[in-house]
A protein has these predicted regions:
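Catalytic cores of soluble metabolic enzymes centered on carboxylation/carboxyl-transfer
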Residues: 168, 208-366
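N-terminal beta-alpha lobe that positions the nucleotide/phosphoryl donor
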Residues: 1-183, 187-204
Length: 366
């Protein structure tokens, strides 16, 4: 699309085709991050066979993760804990990558067990300016896909926060990035270090939490940048006020391994009130198809601090009524009320425990 727009004299509101290609290919993106001085995980270039993967995994040290070079959305990613698994996992990951992306190229990275997923929102213009709008924590995930996001990231030091923001700006500046983008990192909580994961050259699903605490309309900035205007803000203009949390409400039954639940919505009563934002396409009578992503709504709540934002989110989820399809509302209420989540002790495996401990609320209201 970006190429077609350029060839026909149409200005795409978004980054260039070259940047999309560079960051869309994870191996090239890793190389560009390293060139910009951004830490990267021990890993590999393209892995051509299971035997080669075994050799690299032995050098890096287990566990490792096999990843699709053209991947995204959690597809084409497999954790390997034993060398004996590699042949089978390599075949499965390459087949999944080929089916999802038309490219079965794989690479290896060291796997971090006690990890957090922290990302930084950046904006860049055609005049060489790049700023960040702070970071988000997106560690609460199922199948490598985000479920709850919040900003700013809790339980990190000021030094860590400054360093991860600086790294994101460094990468975007180094490649001359124009538009809104998100630089994603994996944080090793045991070592207190972070590593480049990928860069998404678009507005993220979770961008509202950043908008709510900065007061900056990211989409409006995208249009201004596309029109050739300089950024509306210098870095010194960006201030973080309060705390925002976003819950993704999906048509899925969490207790059944997040099984999709298509159907017709027979009741739709979202919460309302100060500090509540709802981004959704749904309404009573809407039919949720079986063919597309299961996201029904993004519920965003803002408070003066994290504790008050959590309390407000708990209330908002409690008053959200959806019938006709199974949803993740019960799971989200359970997650927000969890002691570890409430204290900010999160990692990318938290959802696995939450599902095991989730109380039985009976069948969903369908």
């Amino acid at each position: 699309l970006a190429d077609a727009c350029a060839e026909n004299g149409i200005k795409l509101v978004g980054p260039s085709a070259d940047h999309m290609r560079q960051m869309g290919h994870k191996i090239e993106a890793r190389a560009l991050a390293a060139k910009a001085g951004v830490p990267t995980l021990a890993g590999s270039e393209r892995v051509g066979s299971a035997d080669e993967a075994q050799m690299i995994a032995t050098r890096i040290g287990l566990p490792v993760m096999l990843k699709a070079a053209s991947g995204g959305g959690g597809r084409g990613m497999k954790i390997v804990t034993e060398v004996s698994q590699l042949a089978e996992v390599f075949t499965a990951a390459s087949a999944e990558a080929r089916a999802a992306f038309g490219d079965d190229t794989l690479y290896l990275e060291r796997y971090i067990a006690n990890a957090r997923h922290i990302e930084v929102q950046v904006l860049g213009d055609a005049h060489g300016s790049v700023i960040h709008l702070g970071e988000r924590d997106c560690s609460t995930q199922r199948r490598h896909q985000k479920v709850i996001e919040e900003a700013p990231a809790p339980n990190i030091s000021d030094e860590f926060r400054d360093n991860i923001r600086t790294a994101a700006v460094s990468l975007a500046s180094n490649i001359g990035y124009e538009g809104a983008g998100t630089v994603e990192f994996i944080a090793d909580q045991d070592k207190g270090e972070f590593y480049f994961l990928e860069m998404n050259c678009r507005v993220q699903v979770e961008h509202p939490v950043t908008e709510m605490i900065t007061g900056i309309d990211i989409v409006q900035e995208q249009f201004r940048i596309a029109g050739g205007a300089p950024l509306s803000y210098a870095q010194s203009d960006v201030t973080i006020n309060g705390h925002a949390i976003e819950c993704r409400i999906n048509a899925e039954i969490a207790a059944e391994d997040f099984r999709p639940s298509p159907g017709t919505i027979t009741a739709w009563q979202p919460p309302e009130g100060p500090g509540i934002r709802l981004d959704s396409h749904c309404y009573e009578g809407y039919t949720v198809p079986m063919f597309y992503d299961s996201l029904l709504a993004k519920l965003i709540v803002t408070g003066p601090d994290r504790a008050q934002a959590l309390a407000a989110m708990n209330e908002a989820l409690r008053h959200f009524r959806i019938e006709g399809v199974g949803t993740t509302l019960a799971f989200l209420r359970h997650a927000i009320g969890d002691a570890d989540f409430a204290s900010g002790k999160v990692n990318t495996t938290l959802v696995d425990r939450l599902i095991r401990e989730m109380p039985d609320e009976g069948p969903p209201t369908i």
